[in-house]
Regions:
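Functional cation/ligand-contacting sites centered on basic and imidazole/sulfhydryl donors
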Residues: 1-169
Length: 169
């Protein structure tokens, strides 16, 4: 039997090859497709965030080793993707893992939708309030978490935007 790399090269993935022949494996391999998507999506969201802040006049420096963004030499952000997990109970939850070794000022947790194919919402989590290694989010969270939730990144962009001040008379 050929190695899985042959199937991946020919069909895109072993799961896709299974689907083409109508085979349903005993194990759920959807997480492999999700991981593949996340590897493509993460650089896109970092680039979009970096570009948008720069378009507003903000100065963005990205650490190439960690992807930590330093904004206007004032604060740093780390973007993390939180995949949707649905156990047998049917209740969706998300695990947000903080990169405690890098200690960014703000962790931007991008919570993915139920298909793990698009951003659902964003949590702007300051290190001062969330210094632990991670948190668990549900579909509905306590006000302590919900107060950090946003439908888009406009609040972050507002923090990074540079505004010219008129000269005083």
């Amino acid at each position: 039997m050929p190695p899985t790399s042959i199937y991946s090269h020919r069909f895109g993935s072993l799961v896709r090859a299974y689907q083409m022949v109508g085979f349903t494996p005993d194990r759920d391999y959807r997480y492999l497709e999700t991981n593949k998507f996340l590897r493509r999506f993460y650089p896109e969201i970092v680039n979009q965030t970096e570009s948008h802040i720069a378009s507003l006049g903000g100065i963005v420096r990205r650490d190439p080793a960690t992807d930590i963004l330093r904004i206007n030499d004032e604060f740093s952000i780390s973007l993390v993707l939180a995949r949707c997990q649905a156990p047998n109970s049917g209740r969706h939850h998300w695990k947000v893992r903080f990169d405690t070794s890098l200690t960014p000022d703000i962790t931007v947790a991008v919570r993915l939708d139920q298909t793990n194919q698009a951003a659902l919402d964003y949590f702007l989590l300051p290190n001062l309030d969330f210094g632990q290694s991670g948190i668990n989010l549900a579909e509905r969270n306590s006000v302590e978490f919900e107060s950090y939730r946003f439908n888009n990144l406009n609040y972050l962009y507002g923090m990074a935007e540079r505004i010219r001040l008129r000269r005083a008379a």
